[in-house]
């Protein structure tokens, strides 16, 4: 399913270290030629200090050739640089290991106070911060993400938000936590980075748009692994205008992930309301991006094309199973998508043949009946089954006029927001730019 693979588009907005897990996944799925993927890895590794990894990839690619001299020399250089930086950083690290310093770090959020404490007790100087940052960056480039995260934490606690490396250190810390799969810490870092970007009054509107676009892509790692991720992704991508604007302007392919998060959301009430807002966005962007997942929603909720929805659902399975971020959502997606087809079909028909439903849901009649029985049993459906006639008779789920007014009022704010964003989007079309080089080609640090 290379046709629907988004790795190339997404990698453009990621740090090169974050691309490696995606390439490993593609290698397992055998979507692309293995040699092409190995060439891609080698190219990504060329500007990192992960020389041993690069050597392993080179051996896999050219089994009958010797390791190039340039790689061997680079390894010697990297080891020498690492030893030098370790020697420079060792006295600084010892300061942080002091029990009193640890207590100070835990009890105060004021970086200036902590800096003054370290200066008074240990002779800490401003240039030590630059040394700490350089060492953290070097550790990251070597693939030692735990070391990078530790030193970047010390750095973040001490530097003011105006420091020239403050923002880049937040990107580096987030990348390190993602690569170590520390999802709670990554969620905290993601929130902190978002606040920094949103409160930045120095960046131009175009720079802020670029930062939000990168954040949207990096956040996929966190949102599809953290327990609260599928709620948070909806709140950020759909209901925060600046981020929805970034998606519509720079990366409409992200709608695949927003749509999946909505469909697989466990809160049934929230899911139904959010779906209405999502459908409007999908309709607006259908001319710039579509795939089986967004088309499934369009078939079902715009065209009421049940045969088309069923066909798209089968295609969705292939898309999900071959998507790095969505493969774990497959079962939830299929289950909830079938429920959506069923619910929509039931709104139109009061009495439904089980065999017809089975056909619409791509199930056997026996499977469909068991599935409906479970829905009724779990109080997710107001209906009765007539086993003799093979029919499902729907209960009366009429919505009160009061509730209808509430629902319509809720949608007014969203429609106003969409109108404002469309105006802004048109004004941004001429200033659309590519991501800066470090997003995909250099480290996550500036």
From Swiss-Prot:
Q: Among the entry's GO cellular component annotations, what is one? A: eukaryotic 43S preinitiation complex
What are the protein's UniProt keywords? Cytoplasm, Initiation factor, Nucleus, Protein biosynthesis
Q: Which domain of life is it from?
A: Eukaryota
Q: Does the keyword Endoplasmic reticulum apply?
A: no
Report the main location listed first in the record: cytoplasm
SUPFAM superfamilies attached to this UniProt entry? Winged helix' DNA-binding domain
**Residue ranges, annotated region (Disordered):** 425-446
In this chain the PCI domain maps to 222-399
Pfam families annotated for this entry?
Answer: eIF3_N (PF09440), EIF3E_C (PF21357), PCI (PF01399)
An example Gene Ontology molecular-function term: translation initiation factor activity
Per the record, the GO terms for biological process are: formation of cytoplasmic translation initiation complex; translational initiation
PROSITE patterns to which the protein is assigned, alphabetical? PCI
Among InterPro entries, the record links this protein to: eIF3e (IPR016650), eIF3e_N (IPR019010), PCI_dom (IPR000717), WH_DNA-bd_sf (IPR036390)
**Where does this protein reside within or beyond the cell?**
Cytoplasm; Nucleus
Q: Which PANTHER family does its entry note?
A: EUKARYOTIC TRANSLATION INITIATION FACTOR 3 SUBUNIT E (PTHR10317)
On subunit structure and binding partners, the annotation says:
Component of the eukaryotic translation initiation factor 3 (eIF-3) complex, which is composed of 13 subunits: eif3a, eif3b, eif3c, eif3d, eif3e, eif3f, eif3g, eif3h, eif3i, eif3j, eif3k, eif3l and eif3m.
Instruction: Name the protein family.
Output: Belongs to the eIF-3 subunit E family.
Annotated function: Component of the eukaryotic translation initiation factor 3 (eIF-3) complex, which is involved in protein synthesis of a specialized repertoire of mRNAs and, together with other initiation factors, stimulates binding of mRNA and methionyl-tRNAi to the 40S ribosome. The eIF-3 complex specifically targets and initiates translation of a subset of mRNAs involved in cell proliferation.
> What is the recorded name of this protein?
Eukaryotic translation initiation factor 3 subunit E-B
Q: Which gene encodes it?
A: eif3e-b
């Amino acid at each position: 399913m290379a046709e629907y693979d988004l790795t190339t588009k997404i990698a453009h907005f990621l740090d090169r270290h974050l691309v490696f897990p995606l390439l490993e996944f593609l290698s397992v799925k055998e979507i692309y030629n293995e040699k092409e993927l190995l060439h891609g890895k080698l190219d990504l590794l060329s500007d990192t200090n992960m020389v041993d990894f690069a050597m392993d990839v080179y051996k896999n690619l050219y089994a009958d050739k010797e390791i190039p001299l340039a790689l061997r020399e680079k390894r010697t250089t990297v080891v020498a640089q690492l030893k030098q930086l370790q020697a420079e950083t060792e006295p600084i690290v010892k300061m942080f290991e002091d029990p009193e310093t640890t207590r100070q770090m835990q009890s105060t959020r004021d970086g200036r106070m902590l800096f003054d404490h370290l200066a008074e007790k240990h002779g800490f100087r401003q240039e030590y911060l630059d040394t700490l940052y350089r060492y953290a960056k070097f550790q990251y480039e070597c693939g030692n993400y735990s070391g990078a995260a530790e030193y970047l934490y010390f750095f973040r606690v001490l530097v003011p938000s105006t420091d020239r490396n403050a923002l880049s250190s937040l990107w580096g810390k987030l990348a390190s936590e993602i690569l170590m799969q520390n999802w709670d810490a990554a969620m905290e870092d993601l929130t902190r980075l978002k606040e920094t970007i949103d409160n930045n009054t120095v960046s131009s509107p175009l720079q802020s748009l670029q930062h939000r676009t990168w954040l949207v892509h990096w956040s996929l790692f966190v949102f599809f692994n953290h327990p609260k991720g599928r709620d948070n992704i909806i709140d950020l991508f759909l209901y925060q205008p600046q981020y929805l604007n970034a998606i519509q302007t720079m990366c409409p392919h992200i709608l695949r992930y927003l749509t999946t998060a909505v469909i697989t959301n466990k809160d049934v009430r929230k899911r139904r309301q959010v779906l209405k807002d999502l459908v409007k966005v999908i309709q607006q962007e259908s001319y710039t991006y579509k795939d089986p997942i967004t088309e499934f929603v369009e078939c079902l909720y715009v065209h009421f094309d049940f045969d088309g929805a069923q066909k798209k659902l089968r295609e969705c399975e292939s898309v999900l199973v071959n998507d790095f971020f969505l493969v774990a959502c497959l079962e939830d997606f299929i289950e909830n998508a079938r429920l959506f087809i069923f619910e929509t079909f039931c709104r139109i028909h009061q009495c439904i043949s089980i065999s017809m439903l089975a056909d619409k849901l791509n199930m056997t009649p026996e499977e469909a009946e068991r599935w409906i029985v479970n829905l009724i049993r779990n109080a997710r459906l107001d209906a009765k089954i007539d086993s003799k006639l093979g029919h499902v008779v729907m209960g009366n789920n009429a919505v009160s006029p009061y509730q209808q007014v509430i629902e319509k009022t809720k949608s007014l704010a969203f429609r106003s927001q969409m109108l404002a964003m469309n105006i802004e989007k048109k004004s941004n079309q001429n200033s659309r730019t590519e991501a800066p080089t470090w997003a995909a080609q250099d480290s996550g640090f500036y």
